[in-house]
Amino acid sequence: RRVPFHARWRHFEVGGRDRWAALAKTLKGDAAERARIRVELAITSVLLDAGAGPDWGYREPDSGERYARSEGLAVASFDLYRRGGFSNDPAKPLRADAEALKRFGAPALAMAFQVFPHNPLIGLAGRAALIASVGGVVAARPDLFGAGARLGHLFDHLAGQAKDGVLPVTLIFATLLDAFSPIWPSRLDIEGVALGDVWKHPAARAKDRTDGLVPFHKLSQWLAYSLVEPLEEAGVRVVDLDALTGLPEYRNGGLLSD
């Protein structure tokens, strides 16, 4: 039996409901457009996922069920995307473009995620700011996101890098690091490039500028895993998955320790 990828798509299936499959049945257009939608959904949802705190939860309108933590954030972000929360075109809700992303703010996120005094979400403003910064990146990189400045055009760029329909996962990962390095809070940098989820440790020895640095890139790796299924559904075979690591966080660390 094939074990599913550790990707955001598993959270969209919480409660025994495959929300993506249900949405996909309503889609019109070719496989590439479907893949663009999946890429946008994965990226925005992953970037909105962080510790929600013990008191927050999301009541799903369709089912009436309440979900908390990562599962709740997944369902809430799925609904936000589906309703056109990242689209600048009311006639085309299933898209994430630079203009809508750039103006995304905490009030819109609070409304979409049902945040009230009795249902507080940790890091609300920071999450919204991260999405807005993605809009700036999408606008500034037509080489990755096309002249139309749409987040989903990252699919077209990645598919164009495949050779004979085959794409190494390391190329997906490197593209994500290149594309989104400006959005991360800067602790460490090399020649003005923010390194993101990279930390110092004296045991990490190297003979170049990475001396003393340990890369984790948890969210970027999770994004890479989460883009595999959209690409493969569109006919791009992703290979060399073992080149990535397990996500460096407490649950996976505990699993490896066990």
What are these regions (language model features)?
Residues R1-D258:
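Extended, well-ordered protein cores
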